[in-house]
């Protein structure tokens, strides 16, 4: 239950049922963070109980409400999270398009920020496979959305990300 009043569990259960019944079949589900309200491990476990009912594979990155430590504990069995980095980013080539999950979070802060290390990782990852269409997913948008209370929590250096992406044609934006 988020914010003490919204039954997010029922909403997630309904979404999972809808995705599982969707035709044509959904090939993958991308989850871009804020899985929990306050980062509690128990909340991650509740999420896992529900999301494990999904038929298609699912891929997840943390949001600013998610504790990195508890996130990694809750998803330690997800093969794609085994990158050995301090940040939670990865690439998956199991689909017709390449998926890159990218960690934009700053622990205990609402906004996102990409260190040079993270930007270099992404640049190297994108340079590896230039011919395969790629979907990059992350929690914080790199641009203003027009939602004022969200735009103050955006990706602080989003322009740097957009600049990097312009040199990689396989990521459409």
Q: Where in this protein do the model-derived segments appear?
A:
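Short, basic/glycine-rich phosphate-binding loops at helix/coil junctions
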Residues: 1, 26, 97-106, 141-144
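Extended active-site neighborhood of metal-dependent phosphoesterases/phosphodiesterases
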Residues: 40-129, 133, 153-170
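Short acidic, glycine-rich surface-loop motifs adjacent to enzyme active sites
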Residues: 129-145
């Amino acid at each position: 239950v988020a914010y003490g009043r919204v039954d997010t569990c029922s909403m997630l259960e309904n979404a999972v049922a809808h995705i599982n019944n969707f035709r044509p079949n959904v090939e993958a589900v991308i989850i871009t963070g804020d899985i929990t309200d306050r980062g509690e491990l128990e909340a991650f476990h509740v999420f896992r109980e529900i999301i494990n009912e999904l038929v298609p594979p699912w891929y997840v990155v943390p949001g600013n409400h998610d504790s990195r430590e508890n996130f990694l504990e809750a998803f330690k069995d997800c093969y794609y999270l085994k990158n050995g980095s301090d940040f939670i980013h990865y690439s998956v080539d199991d689909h017709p398009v390449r998926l890159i999950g990218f960690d934009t979070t700053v622990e205990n802060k609402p906004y996102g920020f990409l260190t040079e290390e993270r930007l270099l990782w992404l640049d190297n990852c994108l340079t590896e496979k230039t011919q395969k269409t790629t979907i990059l997913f992350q929690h914080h948008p790199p641009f203003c959305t027009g939602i004022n209370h969200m735009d103050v929590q955006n990706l602080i250096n989003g322009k740097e990300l957009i600049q990097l992406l312009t040199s990689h044609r396989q990521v459409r934006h």
